[in-house]
Swiss-Prot record:
GO molecular function: metal ion binding; metalloendopeptidase activity
InterPro entries reported in the protein's UniProt record: Metalloenz_LuxS/M16, MPP/UQCRC_Complex, Pept_M16_N, Pept_M16_Zn_BS, Peptidase_M16_C
Pfam family, one: Peptidase_M16
Broad EC category: hydrolase
The organism of origin for this protein: Rickettsia bellii (strain RML369-C)
Cofactor, how bound (note): Divalent metal cations. Binds Zn(2+).
Cofactor: Zn(2+)
UniProt-annotated catalytic positions: E52 (proton acceptor)
Family: Belongs to the peptidase M16 family.
GO BP terms: proteolysis
EC number from the UniProt entry: 3.4.24.-
Annotated positions binding Zn(2+): H49, H53, E129
Name recorded for this polypeptide: Uncharacterized zinc protease RBE_0522
Keywords tagged on the record: Hydrolase, Metal-binding, Metalloprotease, Protease, Zinc
Length: 412
């Protein structure tokens, strides 16, 4: 329902997106900064994530405690996260408190104090976060996996950074990074719920008046490389991650062809991997596949965990299923995958948090709003031949593999 969607651009370049859902009593606010870990220069690894942490640590007019108290006083939820290509500051509040929440978010992205004592304290917190990731087998194997996929590139490096890089950051580093990237051209303010677009535009003009226009940030093109990595670790199970060059955001038709492929291959209980690897052979409890798109690249990932002595058999069976996937797709498989996408899309439309994130992501990635109806039109036009062609394109690329457990994989 595009009639509920509105977009405006402020004089300084800030994009304002709203989706009105008059039947709810709340709003979800997303302030998306189109800058993540892949925008970091050598020596800056981890600064985008560290900067997101500092949002909670005080501004020129609010202490960290005051920020927490103000959000609690309006019964709001506030948090943030950093990805490879974006940083998101988000909140969920009652509609009557939208402007108050927006004022706090505007303050932290424009006026963070970056006090050295707070930086020192947060450094210790992030060190613990890094240590936790190193102790988590799933986090560890995926880190090694991406190191191989995008070797020596920002996309292949951990979002958290390393203890060596983050210990060098001081106030000047944060001011330089925000000065370069935290500008109106890189921000998208998206709000969904019981919201008045014109009121939000008026409030945003006031609250973000000190945000300079700046320039859109750039990054180096990603290049899929691939390779194999092994982590020798004594665990209850061995985990195998396989990857191929997937599909980027560039082409919507290709993107949804790949999504259908991922669902048919390993996206549900009726998927080929689930039925063959788990139900028929009993080789794995968790097995599946998905595509991770980026602006200019993508990674098609297959994952499974198995008993240590079944690793070679698991790899062989996955190889066979990959070959089969590139040869034939049944119409009933396509119909089931289409229904999964349609159901998930329609149910998600009822959630203000999803809708706010959706419209913001649409504009940050595609420069336009893509309605569920448009997505389903694309999905319904995809044929079996398209999925087979997509499977052949993806699975003909160089394989990437990562194993964590006591035994390595002899080859793939």
């Amino acid at each position: 329902m595009k009639e509920n969607f509105n977009v405006s651009k402020l004089k300084n370049g800030l994009t304002i997106l709203t989706y009105n859902m008059p039947y709810v009593n709340s709003v979800a606010i997303n302030l998306i900064a189109k800058v993540g870990s892949r925008y970091e220069n050598p020596g800056e690894e981890g600064i985008a994530h560290f900067l997101e942490h500092m949002a909670f640590k005080g501004t020129k007019t609010r202490t960290a405690k005051q920020i927490a108290e103000e959000f609690d006083s309006i019964g709001g939820h506030f948090n943030a996260y950093t990805g490879h290509e974006k940083t998101v500051y988000y909140s969920r509040v009652l509609s009557e408190n939208c402007n108050k929440a927006l004022a706090i978010i505007a303050d932290i992205v424009q006026n963070s104090a970056f006090a050295e004592e707070e930086i020192a304290k947060e450094y210790q917190v992030i060190l613990q976060e890094i240590a936790h990731a190193q102790d988590n087998p799933d986090d560890l194997v995926y880190e090694k996996f991406y190191n191989s996929v995008f070797k020596d590139q920002p996309l292949g490096k951990p979002i958290l950074g390393t203890s060596k890089t983050i210990e060098t950051f001081n106030r000047d580093h944060f001011l330089k990074f925000t000065g370069k990237h935290y500008n109106a051209e890189n921000f998208y303010l998206s709000i969904a719920g019981n919201v008045d677009h014109e009121e939000i535009v008026k409030e945003a003009e006031r609250l973000f008046s000190s945000l300079t226009q700046g320039e859109k940030s750039n990054f180096s093109p990603a290049k899929y490389i691939g390779g194999h990595s092994f982590i020798n670790k004594d665990l209850e199970q061995t985990t195998l991650i396989l990857g191929f060059e997937g599909t980027s955001y560039i082409n919507l038709e290709r993107l949804y062809q790949t999504q259908l492929l991922a669902i048919i291959f390993g996206g549900g209980m009726s998927s080929r991997l689930f039925q063959h690897i788990r139900e028929k052979l009993g080789l794995a409890y968790a097995v599946g596949s998905y595509n991770s798109p980026y602006f200019d690249s993508g990674v098609f990932t297959i994952y499974a965990s198995t008993a240590h002595d079944k690793l070679e058999l698991l790899a062989a069976e996955l190889k066979n299923e990959i070959k089969r996937m590139a040869e034939q797709v049944k119409q009933e498989e396509i119909e089931r995958a289409r229904t999964q996408i349609r159901s998930n899309l329609q149910m998600a439309q009822e959630k203000v948090a999803y809708k706010s994130e959706e419209i913001g992501k649409n504009y940050a990635v595609f420069g336009k709003y893509i309605s569920p109806e448009e997505i389903m039109e694309i999905i319904m036009n995809i044929k079996a031949a398209d999925i087979i062609q997509t499977a052949n394109r993806i699975f003909s690329s160089s394989a990437t593999s990562a194993v964590i457990g006591p035994n390595n994989l002899s080859g793939f």
